[in-house]
Amino acid sequence: MMKKLIQLSFTVMIIFTILVLGVVANEGLGKPKKQCNEILKQSNCVAAECDSMCVKKRGKGAGYCSPSKKCYCYYHCP
């Protein structure tokens, strides 16, 4: 009788652990955040300067110079 109780308790504990890990992993993934962008400079883009302006303005943004030499700042929408 005691052996079956320990086995049942162990099984319940394993199932509970798997469920908790699944919920935690799902929360970590979350929904992908929407990406926004804005033009910071219309011409003569310099990559380092563009990235610096973007980080200064948006915090976790990333600056990118387009082939037409515009400076775009990409960031997660608020």
From Swiss-Prot:
Residues 1-25 form the signal peptide. The keyword Nucleotidyltransferase does not apply. The lineage of its organism: Eukaryota, Viridiplantae, Streptophyta, Embryophyta, Tracheophyta. It is found in: Secreted. One of its GO terms (cellular component) is extracellular region. GO terms for biological process: defense response to fungus; killing of cells of another organism. Belongs to the DEFL family. This is Defensin-like protein 149. The keyword Disulfide bond applies. Its main location: secreted. Keywords: Antimicrobial, Disulfide bond, Fungicide, Plant defense, Secreted, Signal. Disulfide bonds join 36-77, 45-65, 50-71, 54-73. It comes from the Eukaryota. It holds the Pfam family SLR1-BP. It comes from Arabidopsis thaliana (Mouse-ear cress).
